[in-house]
A protein has these predicted regions:
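Active-site beta-strand/loop microenvironment that shapes enzyme catalytic pockets
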Residues: 7-51
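Mid-chain, well-packed structural core segment of small domains
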Residues: 56-102
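C-terminal binding/interaction regions
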Residues: 102-111, 116-128
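Short beta-strand segments
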Residues: 30-32, 95, 110, 124
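Short, small-residue-biased leader/transition segments that mark boundaries at the very start
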Residues: 1-3
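Broad gene-expression machinery/nucleic-acid interaction feature
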Residues: 26, 35, 80, 89, ...
Length: 128
């Protein structure tokens, strides 16, 4: 089994919004990498995350015979493909100093590499 990781950052984003006293507007969240992505996903049942990770690992296997590009190892091209199939930016509404998300929704950094990486997420806000 080949599980990568995902990191929820909903609370950190809401804290950033509150700390900057942003009231109503739009936030754009982007990741500056090509081997990780951003997703909105259920944050209540951890099994959903495991199923999602397993689905992507089956969809895009780590099999060097399938890819030409492998400069950074066996997870290199699969990580790029998974990133291309998901999002590198998410835009959300902010109302009353808080992200507008559904009851079970959370923001996740979806890591596609085997080894842990340092990732940079950029937040940009438009509004009052």
């Amino acid at each position: 089994m080949c599980i990568r990781d995902r990191y929820e950052f909903t609370n950190q984003t809401n804290k950033w919004i509150k700390d900057n006293e942003f009231n109503n507007g739009i936030i754009n969240i982007s990741i500056q990498h090509t081997s990780a992505s951003l997703i909105i996903q259920e944050n209540a049942d951890p099994d959903v995350q495991i199923d999602l990770l397993n689905f992507f690992n089956n969809l895009v296997p780590m099999d060097n015979s399938l890819y030409i590009h492998s400069t950074e190892g066996k997870d290199d091209m699969p990580a790029h493909i998974k990133s291309a199939l998901t999002n590198n930016q998410i835009s959300l509404s902010v109302k009353n100093n808080e992200l507008i998300l559904g009851t079970w929704q959370g923001l996740y950094l979806f890591e596609h590499r085997i080894e842990k990486q340092n990732r940079l997420i950029v937040l940009h806000y438009l509004g009052d």
